[in-house]
Structures are given as C-alpha cells and as structure tokens.
Amino acid sequence: AAPKATVRWCTISS
C-alpha cells in the first residue's frame, strides 16, 4: 500500500 503522501500527490497530479 502506498503512503498517504503518495496518494495525496497522485490526487494533485490528477
């Protein structure tokens, strides 16, 4: 599972 930081970055990237 990816860390929350990565999830947030992915959301911003999208």
Swiss-Prot record:
The keyword Flavoprotein does not apply. Keywords: Disulfide bond, Ion transport, Iron, Iron transport, Metal-binding, Secreted, Transport. GO terms for biological process: iron ion transport. Transmembrane segments: none annotated. GO terms for molecular function: metal ion binding. Residues 7-14 form the Transferrin-like domain. It is found in: Secreted. Its main location: secreted. GO terms for cellular component: extracellular region. It comes from the Eukaryota. Belongs to the transferrin family. Monomer. Transferrins are iron binding transport proteins which can bind two Fe(3+) ions in association with the binding of an anion, usually bicarbonate. It is responsible for the transport of iron from sites of absorption and heme degradation to those of storage and utilization. Serum transferrin may also have a further role in stimulating cell proliferation. Ovotransferrin has a bacteriostatic function. Its concentration in avian egg is the highest concentration of any transferrin in vivo. This is Ovotransferrin. The lineage of its organism: Eukaryota, Metazoa, Chordata, Craniata, Vertebrata.
